[in-house]
């Protein structure tokens, strides 16, 4: 059985789709998936054993010059790749009009998605041949697992979902795996940042733990922040610029992770690493970290500036034994 997945973005949403593939793989021996995903996240599906082909799409980039000759050529090549095979099922797990119209509509196969009442954008359901009612009041991972189960005709397991990508990195862990923590300090929204002085204070509080700390970054301003956080601490390393797979490899070898609400926090969860995520204004309820040893540290009054380094250090200590952290 061959299935096409349409789940293009964001990083967290793409990662939250992986447990559904594991369910399907266990329920339907020999099933294989092709996956349409935004080019920036194209490495992620390849980490799952059930994915045979990744079809990158670049809607975010294309829309800036939709009718230019180079973009038209890219769109033509994408359409040819998308339509190269006939699928037993096409599952649109994105639930948006944009992806339904530009991707799902063009694919060859019976198209499945959430119905008018439960799709993220109800109009997207008009592009599906089979519409499934998926209750909204459950975690995003569970919604996607249910969508796959109903689309492919098996019962959704009652056990916790398994991302099944950690093993991809087990044979290529960093040489110092288990000897360091990773601090994920970067996020896209200002109100989701934990103040730099709190990060530095936490780093100082861990001086006697014997653990080293690694700081990844993506954009230049994040690199500058990482350098400020590391200044004066010999046991803190600002990592070089890395691919997503490179960052994943570092996370896979971490003893534990402390993070803000960001896509890499979901990647940590997918890699089964102990992770403390500090939350301020965002609600982790239905979209927060899902998986083993994922811990939520809420800021007083939902204001991250009010969450002290001492409080996070205490949270780490209280959870250290059960999460095998320090």
UniProtKB/Swiss-Prot annotation:
Residues binding ADP-L-glycero-beta-D-manno-heptose, per UniProt: 187-188, 192, 222, 242, 261-263, 266
Free-text activity regulation comment from the record: Inhibited by ADP-L-glycero-beta-D-gluco-2-deoxy-2-fluoro-heptose (ADP-2F-heptose), a non-cleavable analog of the substrate ADP-L-glycero-beta-D-manno-heptose.
Subcellular location: Cell inner membrane
Top EC category: transferase
Bilayer topology: Peripheral membrane protein
SUPFAM superfamilies: UDP-Glycosyltransferase/glycogen phosphorylase
Main location: membrane
UniProt pathway: Bacterial outer membrane biogenesis; LPS core biosynthesis
Cysteine disulfide partners in this protein: none
Reactions it catalyzes: an alpha-Kdo-(2->4)-alpha-Kdo-(2->6)-lipid A + ADP-L-glycero-beta-D-manno-heptose = an L-alpha-D-Hep-(1->5)-[alpha-Kdo-(2->4)]-alpha-Kdo-(2->6)-lipid A + ADP + H(+); alpha-Kdo-(2->4)-alpha-Kdo-(2->6)-lipid A (E. coli) + ADP-L-glycero-beta-D-manno-heptose = L-alpha-D-Hep-(1->5)-[alpha-Kdo-(2->4)]-alpha-Kdo-(2->6)-lipid A (E. coli) + ADP + H(+)
Domain notes: Composed of two domains connected by an extended peptide linker. Displays the classical GT-B fold. Does not undergo a domain rotation, characteristic of the GT-B family, upon substrate binding, but allows the substrate analog and the reaction product to adopt remarkably distinct conformations inside the active site.
Family of the protein in this entry: Belongs to the glycosyltransferase 9 family.
Function per UniProt: Glycosyltransferase involved in the biosynthesis of the core oligosaccharide region of lipopolysaccharide (LPS). Catalyzes the addition of the first heptose unit to one 3-deoxy-D-manno-octulosonic acid (Kdo) residue of the Kdo2-lipid A module.
Protein's name in the database: Lipopolysaccharide heptosyltransferase 1
Organism: Escherichia coli O18:K1:H7 (strain RS218 / NMEC)
Gene that specifies this protein: waaC
């Amino acid at each position: 059985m061959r299935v096409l997945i349409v789940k293009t973005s964001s990083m967290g949403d793409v990662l939250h789709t992986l447990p559904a593939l594991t369910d399907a793989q266990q329920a339907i021996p020999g099933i294989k998936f092709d996956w349409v995903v935004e080019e920036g996240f194209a490495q992620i599906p390849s980490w799952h054993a059930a994915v045979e082909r990744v079809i990158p799409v670049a809607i975010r980039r294309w829309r800036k010059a939709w009718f230019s000759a180079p973009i038209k050529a890219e769109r033509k090549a994408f359409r040819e790749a998308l339509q190269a095979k006939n699928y037993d099922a096409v599952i649109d797990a994105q639930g948006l009009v944009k992806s339904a119209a530009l991707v799902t509509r063009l694919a060859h196969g019976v198209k499945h998605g959430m119905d008018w009442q439960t799709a993220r954008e109800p109009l997207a359901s008009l592009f599906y041949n089979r519409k499934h009612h998926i209750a909204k009041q459950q975690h995003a991972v569970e919604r996607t697992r249910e969508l796959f189960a109903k689309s492919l005709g098996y019962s959704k397991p009652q056990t916790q979902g398994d991302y099944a990508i950690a093993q991809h990195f087990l044979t290529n862990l960093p040489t110092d795996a288990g000897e360091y923590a990773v601090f994920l300090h970067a996020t896209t929204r200002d109100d989701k940042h934990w103040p730099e002085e709190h990060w530095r204070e936490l780093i100082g509080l861990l001086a006697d733990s014997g653990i080293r700390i690694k700081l990844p970054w993506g954009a230049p301003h994040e690199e500058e922040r990482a350098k400020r956080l590391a200044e004066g601490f010999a046991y803190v390393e600002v990592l070089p610029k890395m691919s997503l797979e490179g960052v994943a490899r570092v996370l896979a070898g971490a003893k534990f992770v402390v993070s803000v609400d960001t896509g890499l926090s979901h990647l940590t969860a997918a890699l089964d690493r102990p992770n403390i995520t500090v939350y301020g204004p965002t609600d982790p309820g239905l979209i927060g970290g899902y998986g083993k040893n994922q811990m939520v540290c809420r800021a007083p009054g939902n204001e991250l500036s009010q969450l002290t380094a001492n409080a996070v250090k205490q949270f780490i200590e209280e959870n250290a034994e059960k999460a095998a952290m320090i």
